[in-house]
């Protein structure tokens, strides 16, 4: 009887997946599972690096085979929204073996903040280590609470490192210039400050700032023109897709398309034109996380589109970008919270579910 029940459950699950696939413009292939996966990136040979929020990093083959957890990853402060976050490669990884990790770290007492470290990924045969690990950036100041770290990273074509720094649920720091909370920062690859940053003359942590007035930016991506875009969690609704421009102020917490969680209104962007407005705002929320701007050939009709991971929306949201304008085009129900979307070397899509036992999914054209 138990075997019959298992068979029926598996058959029902299979039919559900097939029915789901039939309604989607891609085929879904589960590849592996992880405990609270957060981010991934591709190595030059097609393997992936995948982070788990609790502090583990894996080297993963495209068939789902995993290494043992990479050793000597920095200790993380795992609580709330904190833990191990993003992972990206140095632009010259093939020669210097450097990878970058973002994570939440504890401070003295009950304060904590995001940090970025880099180290050389070395090893083979399923066993890997990080060597010469150094912390190159920290949120300043560290504060109490355990949310809104942001800590997404992206390199531009010139080798500058951009990091999103959330407001840490403190509101006002996003508008204050004596810290880097609620900002997007721009650094050299070693963590030093570029000489042409917009506020470099002010020195100290202010010199890092590229843009301000952000709440919790959980995605960063460059388009083919070299422009930086970000996805940002709003308060009660009001999630955003922003075109991030040097020295611009995006207005939070003074303006937002959402409201405070207690229901108190926040003025909309159109009431304060001095602040940069989002290119897309979502009411109700989609809870955007990681995203890409697609440049591959497997889905040529989507070239130049943003593909956004939706947490609360349990979807992939496709946004068409036309010059400086953008609009949601379609929403693909994935049946689970989606944390990350990445483009593989062949142009297929790779997706991480946000859960204990969250799956790594490969999305391919329906006729592949």
Please describe what each predicted stretch is.
Residues 1-8:
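Sec-dependent signal peptide recognition
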Residues 68-82, 131-149, 189-210, 252-283:
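Surface-exposed loop and turn segments in beta-propeller and other repeat-based domains
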Residues 229, 236-242, 249-253, 259-264, ...:
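Short acidic/glycine-rich loop or secondary-structure boundary segments that cap or lie
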Residues 114-125, 177-190, 244-245:
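Beta-propeller blade signature
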Residues 205-240, 245:
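Repeat-solenoid scaffold signature
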Residues 214, 325-345:
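Conserved blade-ending motifs and adjacent loop-strand segments that build the rim/top face
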Residues 19-171, 219, 227-230, 234, ...:
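Acidic, Gly/Ser/Thr-rich repeat motifs that build Ca2+-stabilized beta-propeller blades
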Residues 14-16:
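N-terminal signal peptide c-region/cleavage motif recognized by signal peptidases
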């Amino acid at each position: 009887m138990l075997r019959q029940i298992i068979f029926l459950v598996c058959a029902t699950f299979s039919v559900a997946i097939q029915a789901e696939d039939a309604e989607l413009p891609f085929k879904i292939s589960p590849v592996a599972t992880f405990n609270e996966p957060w981010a991934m990136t591709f190595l030059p040979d097609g393997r992936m690096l995948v982070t788990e929020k609790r502090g583990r990093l894996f080297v993963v083959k495209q068939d789902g085979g995993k290494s043992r957890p990479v050793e000597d990853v920095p200790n993380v402060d795992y609580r709330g929204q904190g833990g191990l976050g993003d992972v990206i490669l140095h632009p010259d990884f093939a020669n210097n073996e450097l990878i970058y990790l973002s994570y939440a770290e504890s401070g003295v007492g009950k304060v904590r903040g995001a940090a970025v470290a880099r180290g050389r990924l070395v090893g083979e045969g399923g066993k890997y280590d990080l060597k010469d690990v150094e912390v190159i950036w920290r949120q300043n100041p560290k504060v109490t609470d355990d949310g809104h770290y942001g800590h997404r990273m992206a390199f531009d074509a010139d080798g500058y490192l951009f990091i999103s720094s959330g407001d840490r649920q403190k509101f006002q720091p996003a508008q204050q210039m004596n810290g880097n909370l609620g900002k997007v920062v721009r650094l050299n690859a070693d963590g030093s400050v570029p000489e042409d940053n917009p506020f470099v003359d002010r020195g100290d942590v202010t010199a890092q700032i590229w843009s301000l007035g952000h709440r919790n930016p959980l995605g960063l991506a460059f388009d083919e023109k070299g422009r930086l875009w970000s996805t940002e969690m709003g308060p009660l609704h009001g999630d955003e897709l922003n075109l991030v421009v040097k020295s611009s102020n995006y207005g939070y917490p003074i303006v937002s398309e959402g409201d405070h969680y207690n229901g108190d209104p926040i003025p909309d962007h159109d009431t304060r034109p001095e602040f940069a407005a989002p290119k897309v705002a979502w009411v109700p929320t989609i809870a955007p996380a990681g995203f890409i701007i697609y440049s591959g050939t497997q889905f040529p009709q989507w070239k130049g589109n943003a593909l956004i991971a939706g947490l609360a929306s349990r979807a992939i949201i496709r946004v068409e970008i036309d010059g400086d304008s953008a609009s949601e085009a379609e929403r693909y129900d994935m049946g689970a919270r989606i944390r990350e979307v990445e483009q593989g070397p062949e142009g297929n899509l790779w997706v991480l579910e946000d859960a204990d036992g969250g799956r790594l999914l490969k999305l391919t054209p329906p006729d592949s």
